[in-house]
């Protein structure tokens, strides 16, 4: 849907996000890097696309009914927020199961959209949230799990929207895409579309260094919320990929801060991981002159309570009202004068 016209429903606001070249972070790397700014979706993340498509597809198949079906879904946060948003639009009660390690902002946003939140043991990661969702479905009347990790409507959303948008916005000149793997929908859907358009396009999944299950390594705790669930999702099409890239949590956090500082892009930790991976690829000699596209998955405000903004949060909490002299002193220190 064009953003130049008035729309009738909130669902029509989803998609057609801007593609922005990283002029500072991408400078002198050999290849160019551009990001799809997915926090421009109405519920501020890439997951808006799949939540809407999964509900729409299930409705058309007669699997769910507004005002009757209760939607239950395991999530690390952004999918839950998107589903709460789309569920509210379409007339559904929504219950989300989520590891207790996810940020407080996620819980607040879910509640703000009218969803119920059930926290699960963080030690069991997303697998524990999946199990709890299934247990709830079995005892709640008219409950239905859309199952982002196994639902073909997830990658289909990206095949129908994100992939074509990237192709159009780059005028078919995209060479490489890389995306963090949570449910695997972006990598699979975008990769499938672009490879149909140009088989030479390379697709790279991205996972936390600490939880590199696609690379055959064990899952362990990490700080990149929304990625590295500890399992390989059913919808992830491994045949599309050139190589699974690994990004350390601390590097992802540092890059998220760098995005805000140098490019004025306030994204989350997974967005930092995506750009870290893009920088890895841009530095490879064989990619000189190529165009690499990734996503800024979600808006940074929902990460204020995480390790990403720990120092700033402590600073803000300790701020005090100042007199004029101290105000001038602080202002001069900030300006370096």
Swiss-Prot record:
Names of required cofactors: pyridoxal 5'-phosphate
Swiss-Prot/TrEMBL GO biological process terms: cysteine biosynthetic process from serine
Top-level taxon in the UniProt lineage: Eukaryota
Residues bound to pyridoxal 5'-phosphate: 78, 182-186, 270
Induction: By hydrogen sulfide or cyanide. By morpholin-4-ium 4-methoxyphenyl (morpholino) phosphinodithioate (GYY4137).
Catalyses which reaction(s): hydrogen cyanide + L-cysteine = 3-cyano-L-alanine + hydrogen sulfide + H(+); O-acetyl-L-serine + hydrogen sulfide = L-cysteine + acetate
Gene3D superfamilies given in the database record: 3.40.50.1100
SS bond list: none
UniProt keyword annotations, A-Z: Amino-acid biosynthesis, Cysteine biosynthesis, Lyase, Pyridoxal phosphate, Transferase
Record-level GO cellular component terms: cytoplasm
Molecular-function GO terms, alphabetical: cysteine synthase activity; L-3-cyanoalanine synthase activity
EC nos: 2.5.1.47, 4.4.1.9
Residues bearing PTM N6-(pyridoxal phosphate)lysine: 47
Assembly and oligomerization: Homodimer.
Record's function text: Primarily catalyzes the formation of cyanoalanine and hydrogen sulfide from cysteine and hydrogen cyanide. Can also catalyze, although less efficiently, the formation of cyanoalanine and hydrogen sulfide from either S-sulfocysteine or O-acetylserine and hydrogen cyanide and the formation of cysteine from either S-sulfocysteine or O-acetylserine and hydrogen sulfide. By catalyzing the assimilation of cyanide produced by P.aeruginosa, mediates resistance to infection. Involved in fertility, growth and aging. Does not mediate survival in high levels of hydrogen sulfide.
NCBIfam families: cysK, cysKM
Family: Belongs to the cysteine synthase/cystathionine beta-synthase family.
Name of the protein in question: Bifunctional L-3-cyanoalanine synthase/cysteine synthase
Source organism per UniProt: Caenorhabditis elegans
């Amino acid at each position: 849907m064009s953003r130049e016209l008035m729309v009738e429903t909130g669902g029509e606001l989803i998609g057609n996000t801007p593609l922005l070249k990283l002029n500072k972070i991408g400078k002198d790397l050999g290849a160019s890097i551009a990001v799809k700014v997915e926090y421009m979706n109405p519920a501020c993340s890439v997951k808006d696309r799949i939540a809407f498509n999964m509900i729409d597809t299930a409705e058309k198949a007669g699997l769910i009914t507004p005002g009757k079906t209760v939607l239950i879904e395991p999530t690390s946060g952004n999918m839950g927020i998107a589903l709460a948003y789309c569920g509210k639009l379409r007339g559904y009660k929504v219950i989300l199961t989520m590891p207790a390690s996810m940020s407080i902002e996620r819980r607040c946003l879910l509640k703000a959209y009218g969803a119920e939140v059930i926290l699960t043991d963080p030690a069991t990661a997303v697998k524990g949230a999946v199990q709890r969702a299934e247990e709830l479905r079995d005892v709640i009347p008219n409950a239905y799990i859309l199952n982002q990790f196994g639902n073909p409507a997830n990658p289909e959303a990206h095949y129908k929207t994100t992939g074509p948008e990237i192709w159009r916005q780059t005028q078919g000149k995209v060479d490489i895409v890389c995306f963090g793997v949570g449910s695997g929908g972006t990598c699979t859907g975008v990769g499938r579309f672009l490879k149909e358009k140009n088989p030479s396009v390379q697709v790279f999944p991205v996972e936390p260094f600490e939880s590199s299950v696609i690379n055959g390594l064990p899952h362990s705790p990490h700080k990149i919320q929304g990625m590295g669930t500890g399992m390989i999702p059913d919808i992830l099409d491994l045949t599309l990929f050139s190589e699974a890239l690994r990004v350390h949590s601390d590097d992802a956090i540092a890059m998220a801060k760098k995005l805000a500082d140098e490019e004025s892009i306030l994204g989350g930790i997974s967005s930092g991981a995506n750009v870290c991976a893009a920088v890895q690829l841009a530095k490879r000699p064989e990619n000189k002159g190529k165009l690499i596209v990734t996503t800024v998955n979600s808006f940074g405000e929902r990460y204020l309570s995480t390790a990403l903004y720990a120092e700033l949060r402590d600073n803000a909490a300790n701020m005090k009202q100042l007199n004029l002299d101290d105000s001038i002193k602080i202002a001069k220190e900030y300006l370096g004068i």
